[in-house]
Amino acid sequence: MKVKNSLRSLKNRHRDCRVVRRKGRVYVINKTQRKFKARQG
């Protein structure tokens, strides 16, 4: 999982990427290609 300040570029890496909020943190998840996971921080 990558940790980045800004998730905009990570969201645009794949068309299936979704931005979700869990426990006060912002994540990018991808159900089809799981290597595109990221967390904001």
Swiss-Prot record:
Biological process terms from the Gene Ontology for this record are: translation
Reading the lineage from the top rank, the first entry is Bacteria
Protein name (database record): Large ribosomal subunit protein bL36
Q: Which family does it belong to?
A: Belongs to the bacterial ribosomal protein bL36 family.
A GO molecular function for this record? structural constituent of ribosome
Keywords assigned by UniProt, alphabetized:
Ribonucleoprotein, Ribosomal protein
Quick one: a GO cellular component term?
Answer: ribonucleoprotein complex
Q: Which organism is it from?
A: Ruegeria sp. (strain TM1040) (Silicibacter sp.)
Q: Decide whether keyword Ribosomal protein is in the record.
A: yes
Which NCBIfam families does UniProt cross-reference here? PRK00831.1 (NF002021), rpmJ_bact (TIGR01022)
